[in-house]
């Protein structure tokens, strides 16, 4: 971690906890800032706040009192999900207090160069592809950001031998100042999150912040299937590397079923481990990053051919209306589900659990399911899983099978949430094996997407 002094003895308000807020508060304290955390959840129901208080960090819970801002804070670090019309944020801006998100902190302390990936669709898949390709090519890509690993936490442990591969939302990119990736990727730009940003133009502007500090030594990878991307390409200091599935470009492109980079054939589209035209675009963006990073053609082909091939093991399935679906049907025991949940912010997770009743109780799972947004419970073991859920106060709903559970979970989800199938039970009460169970989840997600 870089040793920085600019935050020493500065009064900083962290607004909103969850994993990113908790990580930011700890990092700020480590950097010598005078930290106050403000979270809407009551202290008694807020293990994160309790933990921070034990570490000597001031916490104010149960609401967002505007008078808190009378304490002459010099910086606010807010949870990206909190809108800018929130009274606390609006008041901070009125008082000319800078408002950051935790990715700015991550940049300040990271010794590793950053590859930042944003866009409307395909962010998570592309981010994961890039990290996998770098690692297979011997380059050490470390996942962080909106993919479930707080950037400000991960950034503390990387070195200049690593590369931070960071998924970035428009919400996060609104709160940056000096953030400077060496390579940026914008997968595509579609009208989403207009309720948050107010207009498509403001949404695009937030995404475009990713390149604000980039120079001619840096690279931005843009989807030239879109005229908007071609227009934006004229408005950056970074070197533009385009990708396209509809035309030959000076970058990565699809031609006669082949995936090329600057005239060189790397592989064929039908060799990709994941189907769909959107995944061809994701693969082309990944190829561009990999070639700029010095990864061999063989490593690129091997990674992209096998990507997505290991199904049912915390497999990212798709995103619908900004709700991410993960298939972890292989989680047939409590430990596996504990590992799956450890990578997510519980307040955003709707967990689908239950299956074969082996007579065991689920008390071991209580710390891990505490704070979940909701659970959808099914199978023979449902009464036992519910007993554990009752001890946490988590709301749960019943489902007759995985398809029903997936539909119910999606109905309960909001933008930014995760629907996670991680049953903590074997499948044999309803399904031949965990593969069949996972396939039903995948098929249902496909039907929901239409």
Curated annotation (Swiss-Prot):
The keyword Protease does not apply. It holds the Pfam family Mur_ligase_C. The keyword Isomerase does not apply. One of its GO terms (cellular component) is cytoplasm. Disulfide bonds: none annotated. InterPro entries: Mur-like_cat_sf (IPR036565), Mur_ligase_C (IPR004101), Mur_ligase_C_dom_sf (IPR036615), Mur_ligase_cen (IPR013221), MurD (IPR005762). ATP binds at residues 119-125. Keywords: ATP-binding, Cell cycle, Cell division, Cell shape, Cell wall biogenesis/degradation, Cytoplasm, Ligase, Nucleotide-binding, Peptidoglycan synthesis. GO terms for biological process: cell division; cell wall organization; peptidoglycan biosynthetic process; regulation of cell shape. It is an enzyme of class 6 (ligase). Its main location: cytoplasm. It is found in: Cytoplasm. It comes from the Bacteria. Its EC number is 6.3.2.9. Pathway: Cell wall biogenesis; peptidoglycan biosynthesis. It catalyses: UDP-N-acetyl-alpha-D-muramoyl-L-alanine + D-glutamate + ATP = UDP-N-acetyl-alpha-D-muramoyl-L-alanyl-D-glutamate + ADP + phosphate + H(+). One of its GO terms (molecular function) is ATP binding. Cell wall formation. Catalyzes the addition of glutamate to the nucleotide precursor UDP-N-acetylmuramoyl-L-alanine (UMA). Belongs to the MurCDEF family. This is UDP-N-acetylmuramoylalanine--D-glutamate ligase. The gene is murD.
């Amino acid at each position: 971690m870089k040793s920085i002094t600019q935050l020493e003895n500065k009064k900083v308000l962290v607004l909103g906890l969850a994993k990113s807020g908790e990580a930011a508060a700890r990092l700020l304290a480590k950097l010598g800032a005078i930290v106050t955390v403000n979270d809407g959840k009551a202290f008694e129901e807020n293990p994160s706040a309790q933990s921070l208080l034990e570490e000597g960090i001031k916490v104010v819970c149960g609401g967002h009192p505007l008078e808190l801002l009378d304490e002459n804070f010099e910086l606010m670090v807010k949870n990206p999900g909190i809108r800018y019309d929130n009274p606390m944020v609006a008041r901070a801006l009125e008082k000319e207090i800078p408002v950051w998100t935790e990715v700015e902190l991550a940049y300040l302390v990271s010794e590793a160069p950053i590859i930042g990936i944003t866009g409307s669709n395909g962010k998570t898949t592309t981010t994961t592809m890039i990290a996998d390709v770098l690692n297979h090519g011997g380059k050490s890509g470390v996942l962080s950001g909106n993919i479930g690993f707080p950037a400000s936490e991960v950034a503390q442990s990387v070195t200049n031998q690593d590369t931070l591969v960071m998924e970035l939302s428009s919400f996060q990119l609104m709160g940056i100042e000096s953030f400077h990736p060496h390579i940026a990727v914008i997968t595509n730009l579609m009208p989403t999150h207009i309720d948050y940003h107010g207009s498509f133009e403001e949404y695009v502007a937030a995404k475009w912040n990713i390149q604000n500090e980039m120079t001619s030594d840096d690279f931005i990878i843009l989807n030239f299937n879109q005229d908007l991307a071609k227009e934006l390409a004229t408005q950056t200091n970074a070197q533009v590397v385009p990708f396209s599935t509809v035309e030959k470009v000076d970058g990565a492109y699809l031609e006669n079923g082949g995936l090329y980079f600057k005239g060189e054939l790397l592989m064929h589209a039908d060799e990709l481990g994941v189907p769909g035209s959107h995944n061809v675009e994701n693969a082309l963006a990944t190829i561009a990053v990999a070639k700029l990073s010095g990864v061999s053609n063989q490593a690129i082909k091997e990674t992209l051919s096998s990507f997505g091939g290991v199904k049912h093991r915390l497999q990212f399935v798709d995103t619908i209306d900004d709700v991410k679906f993960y298939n972890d049907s292989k989680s047939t025991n409590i430990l596996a589900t504990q590992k799956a949940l450890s990578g997510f912010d519980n307040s955003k997770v709707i967990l689908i659990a239950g299956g074969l009743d082996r007579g065991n109780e689920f008390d071991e799972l209580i710390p891990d399911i505490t704070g979940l947004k909701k659970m959808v419970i099914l199978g023979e073991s449902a009464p036992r899983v519910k007993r554990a859920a009752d001890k946490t106060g988590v709301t749960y709903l019943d489902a007759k099978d995985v398809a029903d559970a997936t539909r119910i979970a999606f109905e309960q989800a909001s933008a930014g949430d995760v629907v996670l199938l991680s049953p903590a039970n074997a499948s044999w009460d309803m399904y031949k094996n965990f593969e069949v169970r996972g396939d039903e989840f995948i098929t249902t997600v496909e039907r929901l997407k239409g």
